[in-house]
């Protein structure tokens, strides 16, 4: 489907130079001289290579027509995971590599969104927000003030280390923002 360059958004899948690219980041630029353009950071879905491309804001781009389906994670077996379609209950076994570094968030019953192009899986996404338990944290030095650091490093149940506020302690459940692997808030309830 053809669209204008100014319509590019993160998450779109584009057909460009005979390959499929996932748009990761977009920056609109209006130079003092000449026409506006879009600087897009894209990831080649076949090779995983990152690429930067400029598109004219009023130029045409070709957006790939993709289908998305939600699947529930059932279990992992080494480098493979088994997931189940939420409506048809069909089970698939796919490579964990399709999730890239986000496979660290796999836990029982998490919902994974698979992206299909011409019936073939081209990418997968975990939810933007995942709740995890803090296993251990660094000790806070008494007298530490806001002017120094208001954060400390915490180890989560999935063996991931992230920065959390100093009031977080082992046993707390926190919400992690998965696109940038950062602390979002303490889990409610």
Swiss-Prot record:
GO terms for cellular component: cytoplasm. Involved in peptide bond synthesis. Stimulates efficient translation and peptide-bond synthesis on native or reconstituted 70S ribosomes in vitro. Probably functions indirectly by altering the affinity of the ribosome for aminoacyl-tRNA, thus increasing their reactivity as acceptors for peptidyl transferase. Keywords: Cytoplasm, Elongation factor, Protein biosynthesis. Disulfide bonds: none annotated. GO terms for molecular function: translation elongation factor activity. It comes from Ehrlichia chaffeensis (strain ATCC CRL-10679 / Arkansas). This is Elongation factor P. It is found in: Cytoplasm. HAMAP family: EF_P. It comes from the Bacteria. The keyword Mitochondrion does not apply. Its main location: cytoplasm. InterPro entries: Elong-fact-P_C, NA-bd_OB-fold, Rib_uL2_dom2, Transl_elong_fac_P/YeiP, Transl_elong_KOW-like, Transl_elong_P/YeiP_cen, Transl_elongation_fac_P, Translation_prot_SH3-like_sf. Pathway: Protein biosynthesis; polypeptide chain elongation. Belongs to the elongation factor P family. SUPFAM superfamilies: Nucleic acid-binding proteins (SSF50249), Translation proteins SH3-like domain (SSF50104). GO terms for biological process: peptide biosynthetic process.
């Amino acid at each position: 489907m053809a669209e204008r360059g100014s319509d590019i958004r993160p998450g779109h899948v584009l057909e460009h130079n005979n390959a499929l690219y996932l748009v990761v980041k977009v920056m609109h630029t209006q130079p003092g001289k000449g026409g506006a353009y879009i600087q897009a950071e894209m990831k080649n879905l076949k090779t995983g290579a990152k690429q930067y491309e400029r598109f004219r804001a009023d130029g045409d781009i070709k957006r790939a027509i993709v289908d998305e389906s939600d699947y529930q994670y059932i279990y992992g077996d080494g480098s493979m995971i088994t997931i189940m379609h939420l409506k048809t209950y069909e089970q698939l076994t796919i490579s964990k590599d399709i999730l890239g570094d986000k496979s660290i968030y796999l836990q029982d019953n998490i919902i994974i969104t698979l992206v299909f192009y011409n019936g073939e899986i081209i990418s997968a996404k975990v939810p933007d927000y995942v709740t995890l338990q803090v296993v251990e944290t660094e000790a806070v030095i008494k007298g530490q003030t806001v002017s120094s650091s208001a954060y400390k490093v915490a180890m989560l149940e999935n063996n991931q280390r992230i920065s959390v506020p100093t009031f977080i302690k082992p046993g707390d459940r926190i919400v992690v923002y998965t696109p940038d692997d950062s602390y979002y808030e303490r889990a409610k309830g």
